[in-house]
Design a protein with these regions (language model features):
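Short alpha-helical
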Residues: 28, 57-60, 102, 121-122, ...
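Alpha-helical substrate-recognition element adjacent to the catalytic core
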Residues: 31, 39-69, 75, 98
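Metal-dependent phosphoesterase signature
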Residues: 63-102
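Short, acidic loop-to-helix structural element flanking the phosphoryl-transfer center
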Residues: 4-5, 10, 88-114, 120-124, ...
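Active-site neighborhood of HAD-like aspartate-dependent phosphohydrolases
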Residues: 2-52
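Conserved SAM-binding loop
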Residues: 15, 22, 96, 112, ...
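Asp-based, Mg2+/Mn2+-dependent phosphohydrolase catalytic module
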Residues: 1-13, 48, 73, 124-224
């Protein structure tokens, strides 16, 4: 364990990624991408392949799904189609991963925030629809700032707003962009092994890794 136990117990601010960390949105994202591809006359992609494209924002997701031959204009038009479809179907199949609700309930005494590369209005709508929004002091998305993760701007803002130093802040996510955002901001990092971005964690190992979010309150409370 890279984080000393005494430091784990003193964490004051917990910053969570959303897709692949708290919520399993894989099917709805895949359906939205494939509906977009169908609309523009392209063949559908597998759920697994689309999931591997998630994590750096909608424009990157759509661009990757369309392939290298797509022009910026093509991507922009397809992104508009995707956003419309997803806005109407984002909660068709999406729910929390096993143990997420229990873990968040145990962590409720600490300051918690969301920092995702997903557009902020979708993030808020999802969290409200799942009954989780009230647990978080701030919900920031990929269009909340001038830059997205792995840039540290969002984390720096959250630490400033919550008046918590970097050595008492933990970034929790499923992908390399979460870990690199944490490193760039000088905070501790926790990777979750169940998210669809988890294979990228080997490229930038987080300070700690967990298989289930219910492990986190145990670690922070010194029970594991």
């Amino acid at each position: 364990m890279a984080i000393p136990r005494n430091v784990l117990g003193e964490m004051e601010l917990l910053v969570f990624d959303l897709d692949g960390t708290l919520i399993d949105s894989e099917q709805d994202l895949a359906n939205s991408v494939n509906a977009t591809l169908e609309k523009i006359g392209r063949k559908p992609l597998s759920v697994e392949l689309i999931a591997s494209y998630v994590g750096q924002g909608v424009a990157v997701l759509v661009s990757r799904a369309m392939g290298a031959e797509a022009t910026p204009e093509n991507v922009e038009q397809a992104t508009e189609i995707f956003l419309k479809y997803y806005s109407e179907h984002m909660l068709d199949n999406t729910g929390t991963y096993p143990g997420v609700r229990e873990a968040l309930a145990e962590l409720d005494g600490r300051k918690m925030a969301i920092l995702t590369n997903k557009p902020v209005h979708f993030s808020r709508d999802l969290l409200e629809g799942l009954g989780l929004a009230e647990l978080f002091l701030q919900i920031y998305g990929g269009n909340s700032f001038e830059t997205k993760k792995p840039d540290p701007l969002g984390l720096n803002r959250l630490m400033e707003e919550n008046e918590v130093p970097a050595d008492r802040t933990l970034m929790i996510g499923d992908s390399i962009s979460d870990v690199m955002a944490g490193r760039n901001a000088g905070v501790w990092t926790c990777g979750v092994n169940y998210g669809f971005g988890a294979p990228t964690l080997d490229e930038a190992p987080p300070d700690i890794r967990i298989d289930d979010l219910r492990e986190l309150p145990k670690l922070l409370n010194g029970k594991s």
